[in-house]
């Protein structure tokens, strides 16, 4: 049976954190190791430009790409099983994005909730939204359809992006002939992990993240400062467990479930100090992160391996991209005669 192609990835904005692990990485590892799927993982550096256009920000992207590569491979993304590629190294993406932009009504894009969220996160008002930021869902559609992905793992907040991609595929296929599969949403990406400050999801920009590469001392310090129940002034004050980051993290990263339930009971009764519960959490998170940190140290010491992993996956995607665009041009028919003449004169 032919494998279904899966496309997912990250913008290279820095090191990955526990929120990435919970929100996407666990699911990606399951997909990679499932023989029914052929996984393509994109490092979406072009998407970084939607909110980061200052020269100093752009120059940081090279290092961030190394960070993403090192983090992916340290947690088990395998370049022998999956294609890891760099978005900007695939020139066909630019071309397909332009073609799709001609087929996509603006009101379809502006109805996507994440456009406004990205603008808020970048402190942009409506008047200062760039053409690229408004159009980035179309660029995402080009990423997905160029790879001819059948499945796209996303959370609830990004389902509208895949729906737009399906609409674009339908429009192209109806106007010019069948080229693109209509990708399905693959449920499995989990709810965002709350940040260490208890305010919104864990993210680099909010400075509330525990990184997969944080050393043990850093993890201990971040857990020591972890937001808990603000109404619990003393250890003898009964505390709230529900929605408390301290116990959200314990539920996710402490495998000793009986211990966690005992902590919850004593916390509700005011019979245990925050510092005790936090100390155990820090121990378990460090145990969880140890193999990733060790593997990452090995990978960082051999950058050539990281470069070859990216080169290998990018070459695979280039082959797919060329084949897809040949079909696009055949069906679109744009300047077909002259393209043939110019190609034969080389």
Curated annotation (Swiss-Prot):
Q: Which Gene3D superfamilies match?
A: HUPs (3.40.50.620), Tyrosyl-Transfer RNA Synthetase (1.10.240.10)
- Pfam families linked: tRNA-synt_1b (PF00579)
Can you list the GO cellular component terms from the UniProt entry?
A: cytoplasm
Name its GO BP terms in alphabetical order.
tryptophanyl-tRNA aminoacylation
Q: Which residues bind ATP?
A: 11-13, 19-20, 155-157, 193, 201-205
Q: What does this protein do?
A: Catalyzes the attachment of tryptophan to tRNA(Trp).
Principal localisation = cytoplasm
Coiled-coil spans are: none
Report if keyword Ligase is assigned.
yes
Tell me what organism the protein belongs to: Chlamydia trachomatis serovar D (strain ATCC VR-885 / DSM 19411 / UW-3/Cx)
Which protein is depicted? Tryptophan--tRNA ligase
* Annotated InterPro entries: aa-tRNA-synth_Ic, Rossmann-like_a/b/a_fold, Trp-tRNA-ligase, Trp-tRNA-ligase_bac-type, Trp-tRNA_synthetase
Annotated CDD domains: TrpRS_core
